[in-house]
Amino acid sequence: MTEIKGLGGMLNGFRDLVKDAESITFVGTPGFCTPFAEFLAFPIRDKKLAFVPNLKIEKTRKMVATEYGMELGDATSPDADVVVILGGMAMPKIGVSIEEMADLLGKIEHKKLIGVCFMGILEQAGWCGTPALGFDYVMNTTLMGDISGE
């Protein structure tokens, strides 16, 4: 197990996990997961990147670097060296089952599967350690903070 600290540690840790990959596809919920996929994609923007919204493989879009940062672009294939499942997919209110995710993964050619989540949601949802998904790595980050003021 490798400990990561802060956002920089998260980015560096993720970049290390995918350093040998030429292409990475993120699977996540629109809105909630999209900015995290863009955040993780920025330091690896020289690779072929894609985003699958929810389980809608037909809506896969390229992730492209622009003067504004990472943005979704034209339609593309979801096939990649690495597929990254973002934790929002495992949140109860999203309603994606392990079986549905496994079915989606069966439609995407990939060599490695990585889970990226906050606050242990992939483990809480029972997605870690299940043969149906078979994560090669899971990156979990715990967020803590405070608000000060009046």
Model-identified regions with their sequence ranges:
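Glycine-rich, aromatic-bearing surface loops/beta-hairpins
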Residues: 78, 82, 86-150
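Short linear motifs at secondary-structure transitions and domain/linker junctions
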Residues: 1-3, 27, 58-62, 90, ...
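A generic local structural motif
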Residues: 11-12, 70-72, 100-103
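Long, hydrophobic N-terminal alpha-helical segment
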Residues: 1-50
